[in-house]
């Protein structure tokens, strides 16, 4: 396990900015899951910083939507979606049918954990006015945003 945590960052960009300012950091031990953080890939290329990545959990995507979720989607009963991960959002959209994709891009309010997730959803066609971004990339901030939307 981890015995001594020196710094905690709210997002990858905050970590990268810190590394630019503080040249004393020589070693980073990154605990992660199956999905690779694209932003942190750049740390591997920085000279003088030893970067260890350890997978501590695995994400397995379902091949199909559950029958209950499929029914909600088909009946257009979904009003709000919460996105904690861009990869998971992409995987979800890939499992939708054409008409369902159109509905989700224009009629659903999407709550995004970060600006990066919001930009990714814009790229796949989600209408900008339907995107809401959490002030901070954490669960508490997401729940405050959800409470404000309702």
Go through the PLM ranges and name each one.
Residues 1-150:
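Conserved beta-alpha
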